[in-house]
Amino acid sequence: MWENVKKVDPEIYEVILKEWDRQEYGLELIASENFASLAVIEAMGSVLTNKYAEGYPGRRYYGGCEWVDVAEKLARDRAKELFNVKYANVQPHSGSQANMGAYFAVSEPGDTIMGMSLSHGGHLTHGAPVNFSGRIYNVVSYGVDSETEVINYDEVRELALKHKPKIIIAGGSAYSKIIDFKRFREIADEVGAYLIVDMAHFAGLVAAGIYPNPAEYAHIVTSTTHKTLRGPRGGMILTNDKELYKAINKSIFPGIQGGPLMHVIAAKAVCFKEALTDEFKAYQNQVVKNAKKLAEELEKRGLRIVSGGTDTHLMLVDLNPLNVTGKAAEIALGKCHVTVNKNTIPNETRSPFVASGIRLGTPALTTRGMKESEMEEIAELIVKVLENVKDEEGNVDDSIVEDVQKKVRDLCERFPLYEGKIRL
């Protein structure tokens, strides 16, 4: 598949092979990662990458866009069908740019916005001080209840009434419970705010009908197209309001982007077509079943799941019962070919670079075909490693590392990813 890369750039070819090997023979539990289909990968590697297409279908600033117009229209139409909305912009290069475009469409620098605190499960673009959103807006953050570790909507309402934000953002990157979009919209309406829902993490679940569709309540919905959607890395913005759609389009181009990535937009179209199938719905149902099972098995073995469990594809695991940091856990599991990410937990006492938890997700494991019985095996392996972490450098006895590596390899060989489908 990469014969020309091999001829022209052996070093990059080697990188591709090593990364292919890492994905094929390791367990991927990072909640924001997934494995795109070969159809999506092929679309991204097509000649569509050569075409500049500033503007929108039928209104381009360059000639020769007749075929990329077809690709973008297909992507838009399929996104609208998938999420039952009237309007879709599929040009954002990422979820962060989708959020930026949505914010800029309805606000001005210096306006007040409300979003979930990053340390409580939000996202950088929801007002973190180091992000553009925290630099150009007056940010009011809400969090989860210190006892239940779920959103307290009465507290959100109190903050909104006090600060009168222009935008209220719902959604997060490490929140495992169903969000009440109806309640958020009621709060937004009460204070005259726009409700923007960032569904990047759970878009696939929404597409499959097993998570409430935020488009029923939000003024604007943003998302990535990878993660649970299993498409190319990119973003999109959805709305049912024609005037907001016009503002969103201007905000993306010429507001914050120039030429769209037409090869990625074509891959988005492929992804949306895949997501409209019954097979995709079955996949998403299994993702949630696997997440619930993994959380249950980890709890049985002494770990604490933040908020008491999960309704989605992800969970946040509190490592304090084992006196292990998120940083050490990430390193130790990585040595055993199990990929996770360290993550802060509510009421965090450590630096984000150390953290007290890890975030786990099941989309990538489920893409391989794994089910509940494999989640039990994986929970056993995770706990075996974590119980034997020696220090902050994530050191574990070689015998344990070798044993877990072997079991991980066996699991991956039982559920191959691209093996036999891609010619190296």
Swiss-Prot record:
GO terms classed as biological process: glycine biosynthetic process from serine; tetrahydrofolate interconversion
Keywords assigned: Amino-acid biosynthesis, Cytoplasm, One-carbon metabolism, Pyridoxal phosphate, Transferase
Residues the entry annotates as binding (6S)-5,6,7,8-tetrahydrofolate: 118, 122-124, 351-353
Catalysed conversion reaction: (6R)-5,10-methylene-5,6,7,8-tetrahydrofolate + glycine + H2O = (6S)-5,6,7,8-tetrahydrofolate + L-serine
Molecular function GO terms recorded: glycine hydroxymethyltransferase activity; pyridoxal phosphate binding
Entry GO terms, CC: cytosol
Cofactor(s) required for function per UniProt: pyridoxal 5'-phosphate
Domain of life: Bacteria
Major localization listed first in the record, in broad terms: cytoplasm
N6-(pyridoxal phosphate)lysine found at: 227
Enzyme type, top EC level: transferase
Pfam family, one: SHMT
InterPro entries linked to this entry: PyrdxlP-dep_Trfase, PyrdxlP-dep_Trfase_major, PyrdxlP-dep_Trfase_small, Ser_HO-MeTrfase, Ser_HO-MeTrfase-like, Ser_HO-MeTrfase_PLP_BS, SHMT-like_dom
Complex and partners: Homodimer.
UniProt similarity note: Belongs to the SHMT family.
Annotated function: Catalyzes the reversible interconversion of serine and glycine with tetrahydrofolate (THF) serving as the one-carbon carrier. This reaction serves as the major source of one-carbon groups required for the biosynthesis of purines, thymidylate, methionine, and other important biomolecules. Also exhibits THF-independent aldolase activity toward beta-hydroxyamino acids, producing glycine and aldehydes, via a retro-aldol mechanism.
HAMAP family xref list: SHMT
Protein name as it appears in the record: Serine hydroxymethyltransferase
